[in-house]
């Protein structure tokens, strides 16, 4: 009613009156124009009748009649419309003003609504009173039953309490039993891990000892090969010198035999021309010469036989030495290949040291200073990795629990968001429906259609809606709902980002855990020389230091000299040069000694030969 009254108040009656007057004036003007057009049409018809003959007029008469009838119909229609419009305007002007009635009707409507509400409340109170009376009568009749039910309820509550206590005790017992079982399992696993660690330490010690034995055998093999090579070379040089001496002796003896043969020929020649007195002396000399020649030939044969035997022996010895040298060279090449295949020991050692320093900090320094600073024994690499693995597993479990909590919260928020979205959509639909209803109500406000004034009120201004209407309230409520939905969406997006970050952290921890497990498996794999090298170089420095204290003085000196020689390429080169020079000096000294002995023997034989020649030439003896 308020809207209808406001619509009637917003009607501009003066503008409507002015428009009606203007429309009446326009009707008179249009009527005058139609009379002028009618007279002109009559004139044109007369002119057409005068210009044309009878036959042509007969042809055009139906058209003219149809046109005339249409014109008369339009004229009658226009006259009827104008008369109806004038009557409607008169009736509108003669209508009374309904504003006071509308205001009174609004008050009457409010009073009627209040009266209706009061009547409804009165009826509702009557019904409630009747219902309460009935219930009161029922309750009075059921007092005994209520008491029985109360007693039964108390009994059931006591039984329920007893049942709950028993169930709680059973659950506590089960939980305690499961906890004890879990503790026993954990203790067993801990003992098993300790046994495995002890086994691994024993394996590491055995691998270290094997590595040292292999290195010591390699050094011994190198020394034996070098010594055998030197001895074989020396023996070969001595044999060659002896062979050369034997050749010189053979040549000397052949020359001596040739000289004796010449002397014998000379003696035979002198025998023919000599005196008879010298026959006895020459016979004795010839006998002596024959004996000497026989002795020399025997010596030559004996020397040749011994030379052949010694040459065969030396050939066999040389072939055996060559075979042994080949086998030693093969072993040496195999050991060199093994060393070349494991030449990344220093790199792995440095990388693992850096890894320990980066991953574990001060706990990775295995020396006396770090022990004094930390106040405890430094743990080995596998134990540190196992501890870190356990720590990462605990962090992974906590992150998994947090992730489950985030997932639960996320699901709850998503469910709440869906509910809020449904509410928002329902509110949007209600708001749209209310807006459509309000728009239709506003459009329907005005003069009813039965009065026939809709076309006249087309240009009227739209009725204004009061600020006290429901539209601002609904729009503000919709805005609040939109803001709440946006805030919830932002919170959900934030939770999703947190969940993604937690999942990424879990993946990173899992990858790091897998990498650490692979490193532990690599370090715990049996039969690997690199493990022995790594653990010997990194994990057991303190134990090696204690073991080195028990080594004797000459072993320490030998080990230190070996380390000093094999430490750098320069030291190895210097040591090799020193051995080569020393070997050359020894060979030169031996060669000089053998040469001096051969020269002395040659001088003795030459002196003996000259003395014998002198005795023959001068003293005939």
Curated annotation (Swiss-Prot):
Residues 101-445, 473-525 form a coiled coil. The keyword Transmembrane applies. Residues 1-574 are cytoplasmic. It comes from Caenorhabditis elegans. GO terms for molecular function: DNA-binding transcription factor activity, RNA polymerase II-specific; RNA polymerase II transcription regulatory region sequence-specific DNA binding. This is Protein CASP. Residues 596-621 are lumenal. Pfam families: CASP_C (PF08172), CUX1_N (PF25398).
């Amino acid at each position: 009613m308020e809207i209808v009254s406001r619509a009637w108040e917003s009607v501009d009656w003066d503008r409507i009156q002015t428009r009606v007057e203007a429309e009446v004036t326009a009707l008179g003007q249009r009527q005058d124009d139609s009379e002028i057009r009618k007279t002109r049409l009559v004139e044109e018809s007369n002119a057409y009748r005068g210009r044309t003959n009878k036959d042509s007029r007969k042809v055009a008469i139906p058209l003219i009649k149809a046109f005339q009838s249409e014109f008369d119909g339009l004229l009658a229609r226009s006259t009827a419309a104008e008369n109806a419009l004038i009557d409607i305007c008169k009736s509108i002007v003669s209508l009374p003003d309904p504003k006071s009635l509308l205001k009174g009707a609004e008050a009457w409507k409010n009073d009627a609504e209040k009266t209706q509400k009061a009547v409804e409340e009165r009826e509702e109170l009557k019904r409630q009173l009747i219902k309460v009376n009935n219930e009161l009568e029922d309750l009075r009749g059921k007092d005994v039953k209520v008491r029985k039910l109360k007693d039964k309820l108390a009994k059931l509550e006591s039984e329920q309490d007893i049942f709950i206590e028993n169930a709680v005790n059973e659950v506590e017992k089960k939980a305690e039993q499961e906890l004890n079982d879990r503790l026993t399992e954990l203790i067993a696993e801990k003992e098993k891990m300790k046994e495995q660690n002890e086994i691994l330490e024993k394996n590491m010690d055995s691998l270290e000892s094997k590595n040292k034995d292999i290195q010591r055998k390699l050094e011994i093999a190198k020394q034996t090969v070098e010594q055998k090579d030197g001895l074989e070379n020396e023996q070969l040089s001595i044999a060659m010198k002896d062979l050369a001496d034997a050749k010189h002796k053979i040549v000397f003896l052949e020359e001596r035999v040739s000289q004796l043969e010449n002397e014998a020929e000379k003696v035979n020649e002198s025998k023919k021309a000599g005196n008879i007195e010298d026959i006895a002396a020459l016979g004795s000399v010839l006998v002596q010469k024959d004996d000497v020649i026989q002795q020399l030939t025997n010596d030559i044969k004996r020397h040749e036989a011994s030379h052949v035997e010694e040459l065969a022996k030396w050939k066999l010895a040389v072939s055996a030495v060559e075979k042994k040298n080949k086998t030693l060279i093969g072993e040496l090449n195999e050991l060199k290949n093994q060393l070349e295949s494991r030449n990344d020991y220093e790199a792995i050692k440095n990388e693992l040291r850096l890894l320990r320093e980066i991953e574990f900090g001060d706990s990775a320094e295995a020396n006396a200073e770090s022990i004094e600073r930390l106040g405890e024994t430094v743990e080995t690499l596998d134990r540190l990795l196992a501890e870190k693995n356990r720590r990462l597993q605990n962090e992974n479990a906590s992150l998994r629990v947090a992730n489950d909590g985030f997932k639960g919260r996320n699901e709850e928020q998503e469910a709440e968001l869906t509910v809020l979205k449904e509410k928002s959509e329902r509110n949007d639909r209600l708001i749209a429906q209310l807006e459509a209803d309000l728009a239709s109500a506003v459009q329907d406000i005005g003069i009813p259609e039965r009065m026939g004034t809709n076309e006249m009120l087309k240009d009227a201004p739209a009725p204004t809606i009061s600020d006290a209407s429901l539209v601002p309230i609904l729009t503000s409520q919709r805005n609040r709902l939109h803001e709440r939905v946006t805030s919830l969406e932002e919170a959900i997006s934030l939770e999703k980002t947190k969940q993604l970050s937690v999942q990424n952290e879990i993946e990173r921890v899992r990858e790091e855990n897998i990498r650490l497990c692979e490193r532990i498996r690599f370090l715990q794999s049996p039969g690997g020389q690199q493990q022995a090298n790594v653990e010997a170089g990194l994990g057991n420095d303190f134990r090696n230091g204690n073991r080195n204290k028990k080594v004797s003085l000459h072993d320490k000196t030998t080990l230190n000299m070996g380390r000093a020689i094999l430490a750098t390429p320069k030291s190895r080169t210097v040591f090799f040069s020193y051995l080569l020079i020393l070997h050359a000096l020894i060979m030169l000294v031996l060669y000089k000694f053998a040469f001096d002995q051969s020269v002395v023997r040659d001088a003795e034989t030459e002196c003996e030969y000259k003395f014998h020649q002198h005795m023959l030439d001068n003293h005939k003896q």
